[in-house]
Curated annotation (Swiss-Prot):
The keyword Lipid metabolism applies. The lineage of its organism: Bacteria, Bacillati, Actinomycetota, Actinomycetes, Mycobacteriales. This is Acyl carrier protein MmaB. It comes from the Bacteria. Belongs to the acyl carrier protein (ACP) family. Residues 3-83 form the Carrier domain. Keywords: Fatty acid metabolism, Lipid metabolism, Phosphopantetheine, Phosphoprotein. It comes from Mycobacterium marinum (strain ATCC BAA-535 / M).
Amino acid sequence: MADPVRQRILLAVCDVLYIDETDLIDGDATDLRDLGLDSVRFVLLMKRLGVDRESELPSRLAENLSIEGWVSELSQSELESPT
């Protein structure tokens, strides 16, 4: 079964950056800046992913601008957040 966090991130990234999964030349480790991620698109992705811009999560996501890094951070964030 596919990881739902990865799928959500991948769909948002592909939509915002106008790319296809095949454009991830290094797979999930591809640096999203190489595919057109800039500060404006980063903010748009945070909105699409439901990330609170006032939290520390955006700065943690900015440390590793890849699908792989974001899956790790968002999965951890979901584990830490109360349900």
